[in-house]
A protein has these predicted regions:
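Short hydrophobic/aromatic-rich beta-strand segments that constitute the beta-sheet cores
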Residues: 53, 73, 108-110
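Ligand-binding loop in jelly-roll beta-barrel domains
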Residues: 93-113
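Short acidic-glycine-tyrosine-enriched beta hairpin
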Residues: 77-93
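Short, conserved beta-strand element in jelly-roll/cupin
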Residues: 58-73
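Conserved short histidine dyad/triad with adjacent acidic residue
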Residues: 40-58, 92-93
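Active-site helix/loop of acyl-thioester processing domains in fatty-acid/polyketide metabolism
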Residues: 48-50, 71-74
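A short, N-terminal "cap"/entry segment at the start of jelly-roll beta-barrel domains
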Residues: 1-40
Length: 113
C-alpha cells in the first residue's frame, strides 16, 4: 500500500530503544521497513537522567531533526556536531559516531532510508 501513514503519540505508545544490550531512550515508529524498501521514520526520546555516551553505526542513510533538548555527535573522521532544537543533520550509511545527549528531555524525528 502506498501511504499515507499516520500516527498519534500517547504517553503509552513508546517502546524501549536498545543498543548493544543497553536501553537508550524510547522510540515511537511512524513507518517501518515494508520488505520492499528499507525505510523507517519515527520519534526517539530520552527522558530523565543523561545517558552515558554511546557508539552508533548508521546502518542506513539517516536524517534527524532535533525537536527538544540537545546532543553532541562526534562523527568518526568528521566534525563534532552540536545540535539543538530546530537543527537538522543527515548521515551516510556506514558512518560511525559517538552520541552524547547533553540536555534532556531530548526528542528527535528520524528518517532512515
Amino acid at each position: 500500500m502506498l501511504g499515507p501513514w499516520h500516527t498519534h503519540v500517547d504517553a503509552d505508545d513508546w517502546e524501549p530503544m536498545e543498543l548493544a544490550g543497553e536501553t537508550v531512550g524510547e522510540v515511537h515508529s511512524l513507518r517501518s521497513d515494508d520488505g520492499e524498501q528499507p525505510y523507517e521514520a519515527g520519534l526517539w526520546r530520552v527522558l530523565g537522567d543523561l545517558p552515558a555516551p554511546f557508539a552508533y553505526e548508521f546502518g542506513q542513510n539517516e536524517t534527524i531533526h532535533v525537536l527538544e533538548g540537545s546532543v553532541v555527535i562526534d562523527v568518526d573522521g568528521g566534525p563534532v556536531l552540536e545540535l539543538g532544537e530546530g537543527d537538522i543533520a543527515s548521515f551516510a550509511a556506514g558512518s560511525r559516531a559517538v552520541w552524547r545527549i547533553s540536555r534532556t528531555p531530548f526528542k528527535e524525528l528520524f528518517v532512515l532510508s
